[in-house]
Amino acid sequence: MERCSVAQQFEDRFQRKFYYLRLSITDVCNFKCTYCLPDGYKPSAGRPASFLTVNEIRRVVSAFAHCGTSKVRITGGEPSLRKDFGEIIHTIAQTPGIQKVATTTNGYRLAKHIGEWREAGLTQLNVSVDSLDPRMFAQITGENRFQQVMSGIDRAFEVGFEQVKVNVVLMKNLNHLELPQFMAWIKTRPIQLRFIELMQTGEMDALFARHHVSGISIRDYLFGNGWLLKARADNDGPAQVFIHPDFQGEIGLIMPYEKDFCRSCNRLRVSALGKLHLCLFGEQGIELRDLLQDDHQENALIERIQTQLQNKAETHFLHDGNSGVTPHLASIGG
């Protein structure tokens, strides 16, 4: 079968190359985070969702790998809710060309399973920890599992992870004053703490107005206290990462409302239902699943993705209050 050469790497009309696939494997989540699924997961009306199978995942990852993608992040929902999660990790890790296999998890299964996930081929781990105060953690997530999640992070280091990334969604009047506690936590731990600005989605207008706070004040603090901006790799995510000689940990800032945020976009998304999303805040996804049924469909799959890439907008339209059709971040993997 003819493969994509390096010259045929996935690229849009703005000369952005795509090294990074965010692949959702389920919409289901067992937490009730204020900024995502405050009422818990509710299946869509109509027939039950049929999420991508392992073979469909293998085919879509193979197509991306043949066209220059080197990193896959497995997302959800909560990806570890899938009973075949370990098999999915292994399948992706065995794909020629894939160098990094990451996942983002709420951490509730970490302590028990992170060892087997690492053995399956997981190379990077992100855990959502929106507060270091157990009561605030429970208020934000709807689950009293703070100690369980923290034990999972400790276990990740025990089984050999050299760094764990911790995601914190910044929310005014909830956790935005915890910076000193977070800084103390990463002083002696190799944790990359990633502060993520609250993003507006279709179902969260009121929450956004009440709790959005910019990451600029944190960046100003970092620059004023000896932190240095770290260079980005081709397949890194959108975070601006800062390092300090006195800290084992790092700090990342993800600020989607900042000017030129989209200029360095290097990632595409495939939903758990097999739809290609050119942007987290774009319109309806592009159907890929009909081309994931047989290995011999790969050329057609690649051609469809490459064609649709030429429709990728130069930037999102969040500043206009347009968050696309994304109802909440669990729907296409955040």
Curated annotation (Swiss-Prot):
Chain positions recorded as [4Fe-4S] cluster 1 binding sites: C29, C33, C36
Secretion signal span: none
Single Gene Ontology BP annotation: Mo-molybdopterin cofactor biosynthetic process
This protein's pathway: Cofactor biosynthesis; molybdopterin biosynthesis
Enzyme category, top tier: lyase
InterPro entries reported for this sequence: Aldolase_TIM, Elp3/MiaA/NifB-like_rSAM, MoaA, MoaA_twitch, MoCo_biosynth_MoaA/MoaC, rSAM
Subunit-structure text: Monomer and homodimer.
Record's protein name: GTP 3',8-cyclase
Residues reported to bind [4Fe-4S] cluster 2: C262, C265, C279
Cofactor note: Binds 2 [4Fe-4S] clusters. Binds 1 [4Fe-4S] cluster coordinated with 3 cysteines and an exchangeable S-adenosyl-L-methionine and 1 [4Fe-4S] cluster coordinated with 3 cysteines and the GTP-derived substrate.
Source species of the chain: Vibrio cholerae serotype O1 (strain ATCC 39315 / El Tor Inaba N16961)
Encoding gene per record: moaA
EC number(s) on file: 4.1.99.22
Protein origin, superkingdom: Bacteria
Cofactor(s) essential for the protein: [4Fe-4S] cluster
Residues at which S-adenosyl-L-methionine binds: Y35, G77, S128, M199
